[in-house]
Amino acid sequence: VAAAHDEHTLEAVFRAADDKLIEPVLIGNKAKITEILKELNVEYDLNSIICTDSDKESAEKTVELINSNKADFIMKGKLQTADLLRAVVDKEKGLRTGRVMSHVAFLEIPAYHKLIAVTDGGMMMYPNAEEKKQILENAVDVFRAMGYECPKIAVLAAVETVNPKMPETVDADIL
């Protein structure tokens, strides 16, 4: 978690940890993280917190951990999106894969029995069909990293039937 010194972020992280979905790696202001963990009554090895002095350093350290396979995915804590993305897209130390960059937002609905995710709610403003395919591949990779062998995917558009005047429906049909 980049810049993990945020109460809501840590609540979500440790709910996921309690459900055995993740093993958190906390990066950021160690004093603030420690204080929040105590307030939340969470047990965590405080010596494993990676202390950084700035949001920029938190973002860079997070990317370094991904590149060295010491972490599997990034969760944004209390830092500006621009600071995190600067580290992610850095030409020398970033996370370039050859595919488009997209994000995945997870939704926990108390009355529903499954974890739901929505991918790319706005990073790619007008993706073409090939870019949409890459966005889906990114989301599938995230789910596989979380232990889901065959995630179920639905491609959404404004209407359910293919309409040649609506390129999104044509792309959805192809995907």
Q: Which residue stretches match the model-derived regions?
A:
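Anion-binding alpha/beta catalytic cores of soluble intermediary-metabolism enzymes, centered on
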Residues: V1-L175
